[in-house]
């Protein structure tokens, strides 16, 4: 059984777990990443967690524990270790030195090379004894895991896969 099942190919770290990713965009994960920062990918901001949280408009407390576990500095260290040299610009925004979001995506795909990718849409969460144990995909197959993480994004850009489909799953 997989340790972690990630629904949506967003930027999620595996932390050494056996991981499977269910991604419904036929072009693969990370399509929205390619257009962030006008195609340059604003990776993070070069500041501490408290300052970072000051820029979060809605419910910054929701991100508190996640950002203290994986801070902006940690993100910068990760990308540098993956061979993506970074630069800091006005407003402390951090970009790849190449100014190419594709370099960031390539590094993340390389980092996730050991993950199993399942192409298809997550249609229904599998709930047993009040706990999510997997997902049923559009082809009718079930995928089980010890933990399930929904990272489908919002509704900002449906052409990239950010169509809000994860909201329905999360309500289950």
Model-identified regions with their sequence ranges:
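Structural motif
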Residues: 3-5, 147
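Glycine-rich active-site loop/strand segments that organize a redox cofactor
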Residues: 38-88
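Residue-level detector of alpha-helix initiation sites
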Residues: 6, 10-11, 154-156
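Glycine-rich FAD pyrophosphate-binding loop
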Residues: 5-7, 17-38
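Predominantly flavin-linked oxidoreductase catalytic cores and closely associated redox partners
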Residues: 35, 102-172
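Short beta-strand to alpha-helix junction loop
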Residues: 63-73, 90-110, 157-162
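Conserved Rossmann-like nucleotide-cofactor binding loop
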Residues: 11-12, 27, 123
